[in-house]
Protein backbone atom coordinates (compact mmCIF):
# COMPACT_ATOMS: atom_id res chain seq x y z
CA UNK A 1 0.00 0.00 0.00
CA UNK A 2 1.41 3.44 -0.93
CA UNK A 3 1.69 5.67 2.12
CA UNK A 4 -0.68 8.59 2.66
CA UNK A 5 2.28 10.99 2.41
CA UNK A 6 2.95 9.75 -1.14
CA UNK A 7 -0.67 10.29 -2.23
CA UNK A 8 -0.61 13.79 -0.73
CA UNK A 9 2.67 14.45 -2.55
CA UNK A 10 1.10 13.32 -5.84
CA UNK A 11 -1.82 15.73 -5.38
CA UNK A 12 0.44 18.69 -4.56
CA UNK A 13 2.85 17.85 -7.39
CA UNK A 14 0.14 18.38 -10.03
CA UNK A 15 -1.60 21.39 -8.46
CA UNK A 16 0.37 23.84 -10.67
CA UNK A 17 -1.30 22.22 -13.72
CA UNK A 18 -4.73 23.53 -12.70
CA UNK A 19 -5.96 26.07 -15.22
CA UNK A 20 -4.23 24.41 -18.18
CA UNK A 21 -7.13 22.12 -19.13
CA UNK A 22 -10.79 22.69 -19.94
CA UNK A 23 -13.85 21.35 -18.09
CA UNK A 24 -16.30 19.44 -20.34
CA UNK A 25 -18.99 21.92 -21.35
CA UNK A 26 -21.11 20.06 -23.91
CA UNK A 27 -23.76 19.56 -21.25
CA UNK A 28 -24.53 22.27 -18.66
CA UNK A 29 -24.52 19.85 -15.70
CA UNK A 30 -20.84 19.04 -16.30
CA UNK A 31 -19.78 22.61 -17.11
CA UNK A 32 -20.72 23.83 -13.61
CA UNK A 33 -18.22 21.59 -11.77
CA UNK A 34 -15.47 23.29 -9.72
CA UNK A 35 -12.38 23.04 -11.95
CA UNK A 36 -9.96 23.19 -9.00
CA UNK A 37 -10.74 19.77 -7.56
CA UNK A 38 -8.02 17.10 -7.22
CA UNK A 39 -8.46 13.66 -5.68
CA UNK A 40 -6.79 10.25 -5.62
CA UNK A 41 -7.67 6.93 -3.95
CA UNK A 42 -6.07 3.49 -4.08
CA UNK A 43 -7.45 0.12 -2.97
CA UNK A 44 -5.15 -2.86 -2.49
CA UNK A 45 -6.03 -6.50 -3.19
CA UNK A 46 -6.16 -6.88 0.63
CA UNK A 47 -9.16 -4.52 0.59
CA UNK A 48 -7.49 -1.47 2.17
CA UNK A 49 -8.38 1.97 0.77
CA UNK A 50 -6.40 5.19 1.18
CA UNK A 51 -7.05 8.60 -0.36
CA UNK A 52 -5.86 12.21 -0.56
CA UNK A 53 -7.27 15.52 -1.75
CA UNK A 54 -10.93 15.60 -2.79
CA UNK A 55 -11.16 11.82 -2.94
CA UNK A 56 -14.50 11.63 -1.10
CA UNK A 57 -16.30 14.13 -3.33
CA UNK A 58 -18.70 12.46 -5.82
CA UNK A 59 -18.43 13.27 -9.54
CA UNK A 60 -20.04 12.10 -12.77
CA UNK A 61 -18.18 8.96 -13.85
CA UNK A 62 -19.29 9.25 -17.50
CA UNK A 63 -17.35 6.80 -19.75
CA UNK A 64 -15.78 4.96 -16.81
CA UNK A 65 -19.23 3.31 -16.64
CA UNK A 66 -18.39 1.52 -19.91
CA UNK A 67 -16.11 -0.80 -17.92
CA UNK A 68 -19.04 -1.80 -15.70
CA UNK A 69 -21.44 -2.28 -18.62
CA UNK A 70 -18.98 -4.51 -20.51
CA UNK A 71 -18.33 -6.49 -17.31
CA UNK A 72 -22.07 -6.95 -16.80
CA UNK A 73 -22.45 -8.10 -20.42
CA UNK A 74 -19.66 -10.66 -19.88
CA UNK A 75 -21.69 -12.17 -17.03
CA UNK A 76 -24.83 -12.45 -19.19
CA UNK A 77 -23.64 -13.44 -22.67
CA UNK A 78 -21.33 -15.92 -24.34
CA UNK A 79 -18.24 -13.97 -25.41
CA UNK A 80 -18.79 -14.82 -29.09
CA UNK A 81 -22.16 -13.02 -28.97
CA UNK A 82 -20.50 -9.84 -27.68
CA UNK A 83 -17.48 -9.83 -29.98
CA UNK A 84 -19.53 -10.57 -33.09
CA UNK A 85 -21.12 -7.14 -32.58
CA UNK A 86 -18.22 -5.03 -31.28
CA UNK A 87 -14.48 -5.15 -32.02
CA UNK A 88 -11.34 -5.09 -29.89
CA UNK A 89 -9.22 -2.54 -31.77
CA UNK A 90 -8.23 1.06 -30.93
CA UNK A 91 -10.32 3.47 -32.98
CA UNK A 92 -7.97 6.27 -34.03
CA UNK A 93 -11.09 8.45 -34.45
CA UNK A 94 -12.95 10.63 -31.96
CA UNK A 95 -14.98 8.69 -29.38
CA UNK A 96 -18.27 9.79 -31.00
CA UNK A 97 -17.29 9.27 -34.65
CA UNK A 98 -20.00 8.41 -37.18
CA UNK A 99 -17.47 8.00 -40.00
CA UNK A 100 -15.94 4.84 -38.57
CA UNK A 101 -19.36 3.25 -37.98
CA UNK A 102 -20.23 3.90 -41.64
CA UNK A 103 -16.89 2.64 -43.00
CA UNK A 104 -16.99 -0.53 -40.90
CA UNK A 105 -20.61 -1.34 -41.70
CA UNK A 106 -22.07 -0.76 -38.26
CA UNK A 107 -19.56 -2.67 -36.12
CA UNK A 108 -17.84 -0.38 -33.59
CA UNK A 109 -14.08 -0.70 -33.12
CA UNK A 110 -14.21 -1.34 -29.36
CA UNK A 111 -16.61 -1.25 -26.38
CA UNK A 112 -15.13 1.95 -24.91
CA UNK A 113 -16.10 4.40 -27.65
CA UNK A 114 -19.70 5.64 -27.74
CA UNK A 115 -20.79 3.35 -30.59
CA UNK A 116 -19.38 0.29 -28.83
CA UNK A 117 -20.89 1.22 -25.48
CA UNK A 118 -24.27 1.74 -27.15
CA UNK A 119 -24.11 -1.80 -28.58
CA UNK A 120 -23.27 -3.10 -25.08
CA UNK A 121 -26.21 -1.10 -23.64
CA UNK A 122 -28.42 -2.61 -26.37
CA UNK A 123 -27.27 -6.11 -25.35
CA UNK A 124 -28.03 -5.37 -21.68
CA UNK A 125 -31.42 -3.85 -22.52
CA UNK A 126 -32.47 -6.98 -24.42
CA UNK A 127 -31.35 -9.40 -21.67
CA UNK A 128 -32.38 -7.52 -18.49
CA UNK A 129 -35.84 -6.48 -17.37
CA UNK A 130 -34.48 -3.48 -15.44
CA UNK A 131 -31.00 -2.65 -16.80
CA UNK A 132 -30.67 0.63 -14.88
CA UNK A 133 -31.53 -1.04 -11.58
CA UNK A 134 -29.16 -3.94 -12.29
CA UNK A 135 -26.27 -1.55 -12.96
CA UNK A 136 -26.95 0.37 -9.75
CA UNK A 137 -27.08 -2.91 -7.85
CA UNK A 138 -23.72 -3.96 -9.34
CA UNK A 139 -21.81 -0.74 -8.59
CA UNK A 140 -23.22 -0.49 -5.07
CA UNK A 141 -22.11 -4.06 -4.41
CA UNK A 142 -18.64 -3.53 -5.93
CA UNK A 143 -18.02 -0.21 -4.14
CA UNK A 144 -19.60 -1.40 -0.87
CA UNK A 145 -21.57 1.85 -0.86
CA UNK A 146 -25.36 1.63 -1.10
CA UNK A 147 -25.59 5.42 -1.44
CA UNK A 148 -24.16 5.41 -4.99
CA UNK A 149 -26.85 6.78 -7.31
CA UNK A 150 -27.61 8.22 -10.73
CA UNK A 151 -27.47 12.01 -11.11
CA UNK A 152 -30.84 12.58 -12.78
CA UNK A 153 -29.92 16.14 -13.77
CA UNK A 154 -26.88 14.87 -15.70
CA UNK A 155 -28.85 12.00 -17.31
CA UNK A 156 -31.61 14.39 -18.42
CA UNK A 157 -29.09 16.95 -19.65
CA UNK A 158 -27.31 14.31 -21.75
CA UNK A 159 -30.62 13.08 -23.16
CA UNK A 160 -31.49 16.63 -24.24
CA UNK A 161 -28.16 16.78 -26.13
CA UNK A 162 -28.34 13.27 -27.56
CA UNK A 163 -28.62 13.90 -31.31
CA UNK A 164 -25.17 12.54 -32.14
CA UNK A 165 -25.49 9.38 -30.05
CA UNK A 166 -28.95 8.80 -31.53
CA UNK A 167 -27.45 9.18 -35.02
CA UNK A 168 -24.76 6.58 -34.16
CA UNK A 169 -27.42 4.17 -32.86
CA UNK A 170 -29.67 4.59 -35.91
CA UNK A 171 -26.70 4.15 -38.25
CA UNK A 172 -25.79 0.88 -36.52
CA UNK A 173 -29.47 -0.14 -36.67
CA UNK A 174 -29.41 0.39 -40.45
CA UNK A 175 -26.58 -2.16 -40.62
CA UNK A 176 -28.51 -4.61 -38.40
CA UNK A 177 -26.24 -4.16 -35.36
CA UNK A 178 -28.74 -2.54 -32.99
CA UNK A 179 -31.81 -4.49 -31.90
CA UNK A 180 -33.69 -2.43 -29.31
CA UNK A 181 -35.67 0.79 -29.32
CA UNK A 182 -33.08 3.55 -29.76
CA UNK A 183 -34.72 6.00 -27.36
CA UNK A 184 -35.04 3.40 -24.58
CA UNK A 185 -31.42 2.25 -24.93
CA UNK A 186 -30.17 5.86 -24.99
CA UNK A 187 -31.95 6.59 -21.71
CA UNK A 188 -30.31 3.54 -20.13
CA UNK A 189 -26.89 4.51 -21.54
CA UNK A 190 -27.14 8.08 -20.23
CA UNK A 191 -28.10 6.83 -16.78
CA UNK A 192 -24.98 4.66 -16.74
CA UNK A 193 -22.85 7.69 -17.65
CA UNK A 194 -24.62 9.73 -14.95
CA UNK A 195 -23.53 7.48 -12.08
CA UNK A 196 -22.12 9.64 -9.28
CA UNK A 197 -19.21 8.14 -7.38
CA UNK A 198 -16.10 9.38 -5.60
CA UNK A 199 -12.49 8.21 -5.98
CA UNK A 200 -12.76 5.85 -2.99
CA UNK A 201 -15.94 4.25 -4.42
CA UNK A 202 -14.35 3.75 -7.82
CA UNK A 203 -11.02 2.41 -6.58
CA UNK A 204 -12.95 -0.19 -4.55
CA UNK A 205 -15.38 -0.98 -7.36
CA UNK A 206 -12.57 -1.58 -9.87
CA UNK A 207 -10.58 -3.86 -7.55
CA UNK A 208 -11.73 -6.95 -9.49
CA UNK A 209 -9.52 -5.77 -12.39
CA UNK A 210 -6.48 -5.97 -10.09
CA UNK A 211 -7.62 -9.09 -8.27
CA UNK A 212 -8.09 -11.73 -10.99
CA UNK A 213 -11.81 -10.98 -11.37
CA UNK A 214 -12.65 -11.08 -7.65
CA UNK A 215 -14.44 -8.11 -6.08
CA UNK A 216 -13.50 -6.47 -2.77
CA UNK A 217 -15.71 -9.03 -0.97
CA UNK A 218 -13.84 -11.92 -2.61
CA UNK A 219 -16.74 -12.86 -4.91
CA UNK A 220 -15.73 -13.83 -8.45
CA UNK A 221 -17.34 -11.40 -10.89
CA UNK A 222 -15.57 -12.52 -14.07
CA UNK A 223 -12.91 -15.17 -14.67
CA UNK A 224 -9.16 -14.63 -14.39
CA UNK A 225 -8.82 -14.95 -18.19
CA UNK A 226 -11.63 -12.45 -18.82
CA UNK A 227 -10.00 -10.02 -16.37
CA UNK A 228 -6.69 -10.24 -18.23
CA UNK A 229 -8.49 -9.68 -21.55
CA UNK A 230 -10.45 -6.72 -20.16
CA UNK A 231 -7.23 -5.12 -18.88
CA UNK A 232 -5.68 -5.62 -22.33
CA UNK A 233 -8.59 -3.74 -23.92
CA UNK A 234 -8.27 -0.97 -21.33
CA UNK A 235 -4.55 -0.65 -22.10
CA UNK A 236 -5.18 -0.29 -25.85
CA UNK A 237 -8.50 1.56 -25.97
CA UNK A 238 -9.41 2.97 -22.55
CA UNK A 239 -8.22 6.55 -23.00
CA UNK A 240 -10.06 7.70 -26.15
CA UNK A 241 -7.46 8.81 -28.67
CA UNK A 242 -4.79 9.24 -25.97
CA UNK A 243 -4.24 5.55 -25.18
CA UNK A 244 -0.70 5.49 -26.59
CA UNK A 245 0.36 8.61 -24.69
CA UNK A 246 -1.18 7.18 -21.50
CA UNK A 247 0.59 3.84 -21.94
CA UNK A 248 3.88 5.70 -22.50
CA UNK A 249 3.51 7.99 -19.48
CA UNK A 250 1.59 5.81 -16.99
CA UNK A 251 2.02 2.22 -18.15
CA UNK A 252 -1.21 0.84 -16.67
CA UNK A 253 -4.58 -0.30 -18.06
CA UNK A 254 -7.00 2.58 -17.53
CA UNK A 255 -10.33 4.16 -18.39
CA UNK A 256 -11.19 7.83 -18.40
CA UNK A 257 -14.41 9.82 -18.44
CA UNK A 258 -15.15 13.43 -19.41
CA UNK A 259 -16.22 14.06 -15.81
CA UNK A 260 -12.47 14.15 -15.09
CA UNK A 261 -12.11 10.72 -13.51
CA UNK A 262 -9.59 8.06 -14.54
CA UNK A 263 -9.36 4.54 -13.13
CA UNK A 264 -6.12 2.57 -13.48
CA UNK A 265 -4.93 -0.85 -12.41
CA UNK A 266 -1.70 -2.49 -11.28
CA UNK A 267 -2.69 -6.15 -11.76
CA UNK A 268 -2.12 -8.28 -8.67
CA UNK A 269 -1.62 -5.20 -6.47
CA UNK A 270 -4.09 -2.34 -6.52
CA UNK A 271 -6.74 -0.29 -8.28
CA UNK A 272 -6.53 3.50 -8.45
CA UNK A 273 -8.94 6.33 -9.17
CA UNK A 274 -7.92 9.94 -9.75
CA UNK A 275 -10.16 12.93 -10.39
CA UNK A 276 -9.56 16.41 -11.75
CA UNK A 277 -12.29 17.93 -13.96
CA UNK A 278 -10.07 19.84 -16.41
CA UNK A 279 -9.48 17.81 -19.59
CA UNK A 280 -6.75 17.70 -22.22
CA UNK A 281 -7.40 17.74 -25.99
CA UNK A 282 -8.32 14.05 -26.01
CA UNK A 283 -10.96 14.41 -23.29
CA UNK A 284 -8.79 12.88 -20.56
CA UNK A 285 -8.16 14.52 -17.18
CA UNK A 286 -4.98 16.59 -17.55
CA UNK A 287 -3.93 16.66 -13.89
CA UNK A 288 -5.36 13.15 -13.38
CA UNK A 289 -3.00 11.70 -15.97
CA UNK A 290 -0.11 13.57 -14.34
CA UNK A 291 -1.06 12.16 -10.91
CA UNK A 292 -1.00 8.62 -12.28
CA UNK A 293 2.29 9.27 -14.08
CA UNK A 294 3.91 10.54 -10.87
CA UNK A 295 2.50 7.65 -8.81
CA UNK A 296 3.70 5.11 -11.38
CA UNK A 297 7.22 6.58 -11.30
CA UNK A 298 7.36 6.76 -7.50
CA UNK A 299 6.12 3.18 -7.11
CA UNK A 300 8.30 1.93 -9.97
CA UNK A 301 5.30 0.12 -11.46
CA UNK A 302 4.29 -0.42 -15.09
CA UNK A 303 2.74 -3.36 -16.93
CA UNK A 304 5.38 -2.94 -19.63
Curated annotation (Swiss-Prot):
Disulfide bonds: none annotated. GO terms for biological process: glutamate biosynthetic process; glutamine catabolic process. Pfam families: Glutaminase. Keywords: Hydrolase. One of its GO terms (molecular function) is glutaminase activity. The keyword Hydrolase applies. Substrate binds at residues 63, 114, 158, 165, 189, 240, 258. InterPro entries: Beta-lactam/transpept-like (IPR012338), Glutaminase (IPR015868). Its EC number is 3.5.1.2. The keyword Hydrolase applies. Transmembrane segments: none annotated. It catalyses: L-glutamine + H2O = L-glutamate + NH4(+). Belongs to the glutaminase family. Homotetramer. This is Glutaminase. It comes from Shewanella baltica (strain OS195).
Amino acid sequence: MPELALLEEVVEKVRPLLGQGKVADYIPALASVDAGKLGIAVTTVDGETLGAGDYLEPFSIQSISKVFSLTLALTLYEEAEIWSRVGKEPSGHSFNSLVQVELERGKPRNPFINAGALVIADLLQSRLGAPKHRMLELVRQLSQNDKVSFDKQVADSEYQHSARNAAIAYLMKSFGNFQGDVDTVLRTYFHYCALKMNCADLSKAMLYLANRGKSITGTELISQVQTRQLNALLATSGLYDGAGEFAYRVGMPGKSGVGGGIIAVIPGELSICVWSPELDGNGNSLAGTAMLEHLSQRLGRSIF
